[in-house]
């Protein structure tokens, strides 16, 4: 699952908008414990190649260097849903709209496993990591951490859905299980990348300590469809850019993005089929409102998030805002084929609103980094948060584009290039 599942507009902490502190330094983290505030923290364990710790005093136990990393800094969150409702939705005896032939065709796509031998590393990885220094190295580690967490989040959700739907609809259940295979493969590949920087996410600990954000099934469908499709456009855009500009190929993981994005696209096609099988999620006024809401949630989150990390995109030769707008345009056009309404993102006013949100967000971040007392910081944030919310509401109220229908041309699972 791509990092677009970072739906911070739905996150009460709103850490993407500067209310949480910026990312801590990325040092090897060992113990996981509960902070005094009660927030669960998780660990990044040191890899074998980590720098040796200072020698311990004679007779004293050896300690490894550690720096805690707050869970909220490594998004997206982990999602759960109403599995009983899911079972009802995919029960062919209850839901006569299910097109099993369509799901059978998709299942064959997933069984083919086009990328079974794609994610194989070579010595270039470690060599490139050793050459990367300064701010780019730090922010690249954060990119790997966040991406690994996103993929692992998808793995856990898809795995559970595959398990729970096995009796109700074995075909749909198997597709979810095969998607969890893909997500696990992606997460493992990214975690191997962290080992090039002498780090590794402790995924076993994440499995035990994860927190869940509950989404109703229809919200899972909207959000995950967008997550997979926007992930496709992000990956293929970066791949094409670096293929045309190889001097910015700072790390070989990007060379894998062309095949990688095919997984994202197949996952999105499956969620498109799920939505078509539930026309009540697409054919009324509530569906139009929710479709616009989730589109905006994903687009705004990505734009603000990426603008906080421009050094990463500049490091690979991209203009952050131009890259994001291209991804938003393409994702919106793809989404319009299935969602009943989408935002008019090509209206120039939409980008102006996004840029104003970025400016407000930077001010909120600046307050968080100041030396003011916590109470003073909170008081200073209030009017800025109100401005940010106002801009988000104004973007939502812009005239939308009436779009897709469950009756559009017959679905054929295929890749977009």
From Swiss-Prot:
<dbReference type="GO" id="GO:0031969">
    <property type="term" value="C:chloroplast membrane"/>
</dbReference>
<keyword id="KW-0150">Chloroplast</keyword>
<keyword id="KW-0472">Membrane</keyword>
<dbReference type="GO" id="GO:0015979">
    <property type="term" value="P:photosynthesis"/>
</dbReference>
<comment type="pathway">
    <text>Porphyrin-containing compound metabolism; chlorophyll biosynthesis.</text>
</comment>
<comment type="function">
    <text>Catalyzes the formation of the isocyclic ring in chlorophyll biosynthesis. Mediates the cyclase reaction, which results in the formation of divinylprotochlorophyllide (Pchlide) characteristic of all chlorophylls from magnesium-protoporphyrin IX 13-monomethyl ester (MgPMME).</text>
</comment>
<keyword id="KW-0809">Transit peptide</keyword>
<dbReference type="GO" id="GO:0009535">
    <property type="term" value="C:chloroplast thylakoid membrane"/>
</dbReference>
<keyword id="KW-0934">Plastid</keyword>
<keyword id="KW-0521">NADP</keyword>
<protein>
    <recommendedName>
        <fullName>Magnesium-protoporphyrin IX monomethyl ester [oxidative] cyclase, chloroplastic</fullName>
        <ecNumber>1.14.13.81</ecNumber>
    </recommendedName>
</protein>
<keyword id="KW-0479">Metal-binding</keyword>
<dbReference type="GO" id="GO:0048529">
    <property type="term" value="F:magnesium-protoporphyrin IX monomethyl ester (oxidative) cyclase activity"/>
</dbReference>
<keyword id="KW-0602">Photosynthesis</keyword>
<dbReference type="InterPro" id="IPR003251">
    <property type="entry name" value="Rr_diiron-bd_dom"/>
</dbReference>
<keyword id="KW-0149">Chlorophyll biosynthesis</keyword>
<feature type="transit peptide" description="Chloroplast">
    <location>
        <begin position="1"/>
        <end position="45"/>
    </location>
</feature>
<comment type="similarity">
    <text>Belongs to the AcsF family.</text>
</comment>
<dbReference type="GO" id="GO:0046872">
    <property type="term" value="F:metal ion binding"/>
</dbReference>
<dbReference type="InterPro" id="IPR008434">
    <property type="entry name" value="AcsF"/>
</dbReference>
<dbReference type="GO" id="GO:0015995">
    <property type="term" value="P:chlorophyll biosynthetic process"/>
</dbReference>
<keyword id="KW-0408">Iron</keyword>
<dbReference type="Pfam" id="PF02915">
    <property type="entry name" value="Rubrerythrin"/>
</dbReference>
<dbReference type="InterPro" id="IPR009078">
    <property type="entry name" value="Ferritin-like_SF"/>
</dbReference>
<keyword id="KW-0560">Oxidoreductase</keyword>
């Amino acid at each position: 699952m791509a990092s677009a599942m970072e739906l911070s507009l739905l996150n009460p902490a709103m850490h993407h908008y500067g209310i949480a502190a910026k990312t801590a330094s990325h040092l090897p983290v060992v113990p996981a414990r509960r902070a005094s505030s009660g927030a669960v923290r998780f660990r990044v364990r040191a890899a074998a190649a980590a720098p040796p710790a200072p020698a311990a005093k004679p007779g004293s136990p050896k300690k490894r260097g550690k720096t805690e990393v707050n869970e909220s800094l490594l998004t997206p969150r982990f999602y759960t849903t109403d599995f009983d409702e899911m079972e009802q939705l995919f029960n062919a005896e209850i839901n006569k709209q299910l097109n099993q032939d369509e799901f059978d065709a998709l299942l064959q796509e997933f069984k083919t496993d086009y990328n079974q031998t794609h994610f194989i590393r070579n010595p270039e990885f470690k060599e490139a990591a050793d050459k990367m220094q300064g701010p780019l190295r730090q922010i690249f580690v954060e990119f790997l951490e966040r991406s690994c967490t996103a993929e692992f989040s998808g793995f856990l959700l898809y795995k559970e859905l595959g398990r729970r739907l096995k009796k109700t609809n074995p075909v749909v259940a198997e597709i979810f299980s095969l998607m969890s295979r893909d997500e696990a493969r992606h997460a493992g590949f990214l975690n191997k990348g962290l080992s090039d920087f002498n780090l590794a996410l402790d995924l076993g600990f994440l499995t035990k300590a994860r927190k869940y954000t509950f989404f109703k099934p229809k919200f899972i469908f909207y959000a995950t469809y967008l997550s997979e499709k926007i992930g496709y456009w992000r990956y293929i855009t970066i791949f094409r850019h670096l293929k045309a500009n190889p001097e910015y190929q700072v790390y070989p993981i990007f060379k894998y993005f062309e095949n990688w994005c095919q997984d994202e696209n197949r996952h999105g096609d499956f969620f498109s089929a799920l939505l078509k099988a539930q026309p009540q999620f697409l054919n009324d006024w509530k569906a139009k409102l929710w479709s616009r809401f989730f589109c905006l949630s994903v687009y705004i989150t990505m734009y603000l998030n990426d603008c906080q990390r421009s050094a990463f995109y500049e490091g690979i030769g991209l203009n952050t805002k131009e890259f994001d707008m291209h991804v938003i345009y393409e994702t919106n056009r793809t989404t319009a084929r299935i969602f009943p309404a989408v935002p008019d993102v090509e209206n120039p006013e939409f980008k102006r609103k996004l840029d104003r949100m970025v400016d407000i967000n930077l001010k909120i971040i600046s307050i968080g980094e100041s030396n003011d007392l916590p109470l003073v910081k909170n008081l200073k944030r209030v009017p800025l948060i109100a401005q940010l919310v106002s801009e988000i509401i104004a973007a939502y109220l812009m005239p939308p584009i009436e779009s897709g229908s469950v009756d559009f041309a017959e679905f054929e699972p295929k890749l977009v290039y």
